[in-house]
A protein has these predicted regions:
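Acidic, glycine/proline-rich low-complexity segments that act as flexible tails and inter-domain linkers
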Residues: 2-100
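Glycine-rich anion-binding loops and their surrounding alpha/beta cores
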Residues: 10-13, 18-21, 27, 76, ...
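Electropositive phosphate-/nucleotide-binding environments in soluble metabolic enzymes
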Residues: 12, 27-34, 44-48, 61-68, ...
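Acidic, glycine-rich active-site loops and adjacent beta-strand->loop/helix elements
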Residues: 95-97, 124-128, 214-216, 252
Length: 256
């Protein structure tokens, strides 16, 4: 995996050409994806061009190699957490999103009570689903805007921390996540993979349980698409050394 310093030396491309390439269904090189993500995160690519590229990805998809490069580049847009000094098993659970889904709020402290350590970086509302961060912020005084140092300190003290993407932690996902929310590209399988896995790998965890929703309250209403997402999340995540278990659960009615 390249260093952040190497990422800053990414060669330049013409954004319109990259949009045309993906619109035609062609595969991006790793260098092209590095340029796209790094330049957008730094504000060098405007929202309207990034939105066009996201829509091209939404229609044409990405190969596993492209998705791996997407995850890696988003991950390296910021710092990653070093929890290697914590000897307990470090795990997390992530849901792909549904209506009324509050499982993380209950499951995380239960996992800690069972002896695990849970460093959880979550997202905000996306599409019609409510985000874990939004739910946490409804609790008076709950701070989800944690620096890397604050996040690690909470994990060390309590075995659990819950926060969001920041300027330090996966800033590329924070920007792209917000743009996907307003460009009708929330249900793109490779973009979902990039968002979820970049956050989870940045946590420094050993294992991840993925709750892939299916049904009319999920991003992917079709079971076969949900199965495809679960398989790609597992394939790409395991290439980064994560132990992953994916379960597909029904989202045809609100949870709780």
């Amino acid at each position: 995996m390249p260093s952040v310093k190497q990422m800053k030396r990414t060669k330049n491309f013409i954004m319109v050409d990259l949009i045309e390439k993906k619109k035609a269904g062609l595969e991006h090189s790793k260098e092209e994806i590095q340029y796209l993500i790094a330049s957008y995160t730094k504000g060098k690519i405007p929202d309207y061009q990034m939105a066009a590229w996201l829509m091209a990805v939404n229609f044409q998809g990405m190969t596993d190699a492209e998705t791996f490069a997407l995850v890696e580049t988003m991950l390296l847009s910021g710092t990653t957490l070093d929890l290697s000094h914590i000897k307990h098993c470090k795990v997390d659970k992530h849901s792909t999103g549904g209506v009324g889904d509050k499982v993380s709020l209950i499951l995380a402290p239960l996992a800690v009570a069972a002896g695990c350590v849970v460093p959880m970086i979550s997202g905000r509302g996306l599409g019609h689903t409510g985000g874990t961060l939004d739910k946490l912020e409804s609790i008076p005084g709950f701070n989800v805007n944690l620096s890397s140092q604050e996040f690690v300190r909470l994990v060390e003290k309590y075995g659990l921390a819950m926060g969001g993407q920041t300027e330090e932690l996966v800033p590329a996902d924070r920007k792209i996540y917000a743009l996907r929310d307003v460009t009708a590209t929330v249900n793109s399988i490779p973009l979902i993979c990039g968002s979820i896995l970049s956050k989870k790998i940045a946590e420094g965890i050993d294992g991840l349980v993925l709750d892939v929703k299916t049904g009319n309250g999920a991003f992917l209403a079709d079971y076969n698409q949900s199965q495809q997402l679960a398989k790609q999340l597992k394939r790409v995540g395991e290439n980064f050394g994560l132990q992953i278990k994916a379960v597909i659960t029904d989202m045809n009615q609100p949870l709780g």
